Amino acid sequence: MKSNRDSYWMKIALKYAYYAEENGEVPIGAILVFQEKIIGTGWNSVISQNDSTAHAEIIALREAGRNIKNYRLVNTTLYVTLQPCMMCCGAIINSRIKRLVFGASYKDLKKNPFLKKIFINLEKNKLKIKKHIMRNECAKILSNFFKNKRF
């Protein structure tokens, strides 16, 4: 059953989110899967890399591209613990990823107005999307992280 596999892969993405948190980053993790194998992994690394584009999704896509020697990541599924931002959505679409599975949505983060503004409507593209796999767990790590930060 696909839902069980989605949970399996999301648990791995969550491990990368926890790693990001342990390193003082916003806790977001991502993995890219092709034919039941992980071809790319990433965790948010904006602070440590001094790079505003070092989002978990972007890092996973870059690694996958290097691994398969192609930027076209067709027939892959991206698992990410938070609904992708506008920048990451563009990369997902340009990479030709077939399927996106995310855990928490911006709504889960208490309707943060900043986050709400940067989401793009992915449903208008050919990307198949499955939402809210392990939603509570994915939202919890982010909510706890932001409780301890002052913005």
UniProtKB/Swiss-Prot annotation:
Zn(2+) binds at H55, C85, C88. CDD domains: nucleoside_deaminase. Its cofactor is Zn(2+). The keyword Nucleus does not apply. Binds 1 zinc ion per subunit. One of its GO terms (biological process) is tRNA wobble adenosine to inosine editing. Residues 4-122 form the CMP/dCMP-type deaminase domain. It is an enzyme of class 3 (hydrolase). GO terms for molecular function: tRNA-specific adenosine-34 deaminase activity; zinc ion binding. Signal peptide: none annotated. The active site is at E57 (proton donor). Its EC number is 3.5.4.33. The keyword Repeat does not apply. HAMAP family: tRNA_aden_deaminase. NCBIfam families: PRK10860.1. Belongs to the cytidine and deoxycytidylate deaminase family. Catalyzes the deamination of adenosine to inosine at the wobble position 34 of tRNA(Arg2). Homodimer. PANTHER family: CYTOSINE DEAMINASE FAMILY MEMBER (PTHR11079), TRNA-SPECIFIC ADENOSINE DEAMINASE (PTHR11079:SF202). This is tRNA-specific adenosine deaminase.
